[in-house]
């Protein structure tokens, strides 16, 4: 299906077709890396790790079994129009989060650059990822934390 040019600038996330919605994903794979929350209230922090879902191809940032991911990885989260308010856990580079927050897509996003390789060329992919099955202690793999997480 042909996408309308610059559809993300003329439509809200709620107005997008399924094809447009899927096209927003830049393929960085960051949403497939494990995160955890520690603390409560004002002391609550969101920790990002370099621990990847076992289905994630660490080189490309793509799911190894996209069509069956929810059957294989039961904790895989489907981003939908219904869970838009929960997007605060997504990386600050994520198109879904950016558009939900009223921001623009970055120049390296494939919809802007026209290249599926622009994410890798812009150094957006997580380096030295490791699959969850190979990890014992998650604390060794923290790469960032979000103090403003709510």
Swiss-Prot record:
Signal peptide: none annotated. NCBIfam families: PRK05170.1-2. Belongs to the UPF0260 family. This is UPF0260 protein CGSHiEE_04300.
